[in-house]
Amino acid sequence: MSSAFEAISVAKIFRRRWSRREVRALQNVSFTVEPGSIFGLLGPNGAGKTTLVKIALTIAYPDQGEIRLLGESVRNRSILKRIGYLPENPRFPSHLTAWQVLRLYGSLSGADIRTVEKNATKWLARLDLEQWRDTRISTFSKGMNERLAFAQALVHDPEFIFLDEPTDGLDPLGRMEVRSICSELARQGKTIFINSHILAEIELICDRIALMKSGEVIDQGTVAELTSARGGYEVVVPAGDGLSDWLHEKNVSFTFLDGHLHVQAKDRASANWIIDALRQKNIEIESVAVKRRTLESVFIEKVSGGEENPAAKGTKNT
């Protein structure tokens, strides 16, 4: 098996019944996910992330292309027994207890009931729900319900796990535990596919990332690859009389911090010009540093059509 997940030219069009208007939810989407990795799918609301996952789970069907999971087409529905899924807004029968939920959903996957019960005990303890195992979930908080849904996705010991906004409703300790579990599962050879818009979570945990916008994959790679381009330069000098006015006149961006001016340059040529000008004014330069782009800045640039923050382009910023 070369890929745990493979999207091949997937397209999906939704048609409005009355207006006959077409909404292209997915347009020729293609990418792969390697076995034993943690993959993140990022994009704004309406980008097509959830539609793609629904097609992978056969909840929806493509108008073009196909998705393969664990080396097999999802048209072979038996593959779904090896898949775990945490939906964005999990809902369980409110009259059931936590134990009953895990036992029911685990058995629906076709797994041996003894394996399901063993795993249910394990994940209830790991996710701090053991004391609530016989409590009806109608009394659960949002965070407790989210942890139960995470346990549900794992209770049948799947090889591939889809997680849709897995840390929604969790406190910082809960989010850290989810990241820890995902890393452990990946080390065991399982593949994790995270659909999220929380950039910090994705940046912390994912091996590779794909960015989606308007139904298309607009970029993909590791965090290092996506953020490798320089985000400009920063020149730090002591704040002196008249210097800020001079920078304003030259339309150069800077910030004031702890008695120093942090002068921004969008590229090497701009940085060299600023350095030469400061030296001609006999101003001591304390440091010059290359600024690396963050995943957040890459995301904003990509989904907004390439427009970066004006402060990165040499405009005033006081």
Stretch-by-stretch model annotation:
Residues 1-3:
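Primarily ABC-family ATPase nucleotide-binding module
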Residues 5-7, 12-213, 219:
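ABC transporter nucleotide-binding domains
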Residues 66, 91, 240, 266-269:
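Short coil/turn segments
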Residues 73-74, 217, 238, 268, ...:
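Short, surface-exposed acidic/glycine-rich loop or hinge patches that mediate macromolecular interfaces
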Residues 75, 201, 242-243, 270, ...:
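Short phosphate-engaging motifs
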Residues 95, 236, 264, 288-289:
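Active-site-adjacent beta-strand anchor residues
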Residues 178-265:
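ABC transporter nucleotide-binding domain
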Residues 266-318:
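C-terminal coupling/interaction segments
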